[in-house]
Amino acid sequence: MAAMARRSQPRQSSPRRQSSITCALAALSLVAVIPAQDPTVQESLNPFFQPSSLPFFAPEFDRIRDEHFLPAFEKGMADHLAEIRKIADVKEPATFENTIEAMERSGALLTRVSKVFFNLTESTTNAKLQAIQAEVAPKLARHSDTIQLDPALFARIEAVHAARDDLPPEAKRLAERYHTNFVRSGARLGGDAKQRLRAINEELSTKTTEFQEHLLADTNASAVHVDDVASLAGLDDAGISAAAGAARSAGLDGGYLLTLQLPSSQGILSQLDVRETRRKVYEAATNRCCRGNGDDTRELVRSIAKLRAERAALLGYATHADYVLADQMAGTPSAVREMLTSMASAIVDKARSEAVQLREFFERQYPGQQLQPWDWTWAAEQVRKEKYDLDEAEVRPYFELDRVIEDGMFFVANQLYGVTMKRRDDLPTYHEDVRVYEVLDADGSSVGLFYTDYYARPSKRGGAWMDSFVDQTSLLGTKPVVVNVMNIQKPAPGQPTLVSFDEVTTLFHEFGHGVHGLFSQARYPMLGGTNVPRDYVEFPSQFHEDFAFDPAVLARCAIHHETGEPIPDALLAKIQAARNFGQGFASLEYVAAALLDMAWHTLDASAEVGDVLAFEKQALEDAKVLHPLIPPRYRTPYFAHIWSSGYSAGYYAYMWSEALAADAFAMVMERGGMTAENGARYRAQILSRGDIIEPMDQFRTFQGRALDTEALMKRRGLK
């Protein structure tokens, strides 16, 4: 059955990775209380009860209603359990076909409803969907355990695993993944331990869902409202218009509403000239979910960390990080810490150097006052203007969203991979802002569908990510249907969407995840697309980021939205020259967050954390990354990646993957850059492979050698 991937990174991104069995299994014991109704009528009206009639089995959003989800979960899980029971009860000896492959075929209805539901709860949630999610989440956990802790089923998987050397390579890989997943899910535990594991998993599913809801609520509630436009001095016209629109959407009587993004440092701070407004925005962002209100998450995260540690101990691991990393490229917490701390010294030194530079500038502007955290990015933007004669306000008019997509991202896809993107306005979407493209290969054949959902709204969680509605699998005969999601401020009606260059690189980043899913050539759902280790999944995304800086790309997509003039060569040169400006700040906030993640998840089951924020401060001090002016990219109470988005003990993965991306991109540049030959090799040896082949073996095949981290240091301006 197809895997349900979830993802987000330093750019708040990424595909969520779950095994296909976990996805399909994750819902079975849901017994919803619904009105008595003729089941035949109910099935005929519920669009999930049959495969979609649309091309590529795309979701029938014009038919889907909130009330369809619970019945579809109920029937989907019942059907799936019956399929699994049939597999476990087969009288004949276990074979790959009657056990592993049969499990991959199972759970079609459950997959359909899960894919749509969990995409909607992140992109356009509402009170009804949140109530369904709260009800479904613990039942999904129980369902997963029902399957993965079944001794008869595991005995058959073990039998296939024992004979795996006789299987073809891809089937052997799949048998190994199933066996590993079941063992890591507790299949070998005794009765009492299994019961405790079930309880932990159910409680964790509830608490992580609660965290997500509290974070969304407090992020919306913490938005900063100002009455006077003078308080927004420095903000461009598009930003002011968006703030006015946000206030209207929130039902406020006039004024301007500055909504918050997911990280600690808000992008808008670099533009706001009024220091008091900067302070309000910064404090609103960094105090989220720790204000002592109903959305305070401190007790919740402490409980989540404790439960994860207990589960790891049950499964034979010292800590949750040991458990997670045993199935990743890094392997161990010590390997992660070694990688992060080996760079920390150079990063801290660069941040100190930047601080000296910014203080000198700031003291000229504010004599007798001290630089504060809310001043950093504003001062950095002013220094960048001075040093490189580069003003973000000068750059933004050249980056209109549609042109960046059509003539930037899609141009790269065409040059590298030979594909073209065709608008499909005939297909329904879940929101008016969503667009659909059919991806056509060089020979005119269809690759799949690509959905885009780029505008922010209160019902969408923060950040940027890729997900899928349908996964590629030759076993089931399905082509990929993927979606890229961001949180770009929507302009006033009739106004163009102008994006920052950071948003441009995020667009390319998420598109890298998109093509990873689109170009998958796997037979089995579990091994396809982005179903790879966390510290590998960010490799294609960060590899594609670098094409945003390619002069040939910028020459096409950086066109002034009013004059139609291409961006001047002199301005392009400034963008390239300033690329690594501020890397001390960016690298330190990231490494601090990654080490904070490791601090929480290397606690053993006996550890007791009292004050959450005191623990955070001590962890950063111990790691020598505590900086008075640079908070971690995410503080503990709003660190969604590790508490609700599948990156627990995994936030390091962005830098681990970045090392692969930097090395691969450098090699591509040495071999001619954005050429069809380079693209064909990357598509064939990386993007199409999923988890069919060990990730590091994929990388070595593409590079022709082992990883060299020199390119990473250069990419971050640390060497």
Write out the residue ranges for each language-model feature:
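N-terminal secretory signal peptides that target proteins for export/translocation
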Residues: 1-17
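Bacterial N-terminal signal peptides
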Residues: 22-32
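N-terminal helix-rich structural modules
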Residues: 38-236, 241, 668
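C-terminal, non-catalytic "cap/extension" segments appended to globular domains
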Residues: 41-65, 75, 234, 255-257, ...
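Short His/Asp/Glu-rich catalytic/ion-coordination signatures at enzyme active sites or charged loops
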Residues: 53-68, 116-136, 157-199, 259-299, ...
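Surface-exposed patches in mature extracellular/periplasmic domains of secreted proteins
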Residues: 86-91, 95, 320, 423-426, ...
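Active-site-proximal, well-structured secondary-structure segments within enzyme catalytic domains
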Residues: 174, 206, 213, 218-259, ...
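Short pre-active-site segment immediately N-terminal to the catalytic Zn-binding motif
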Residues: 489-508
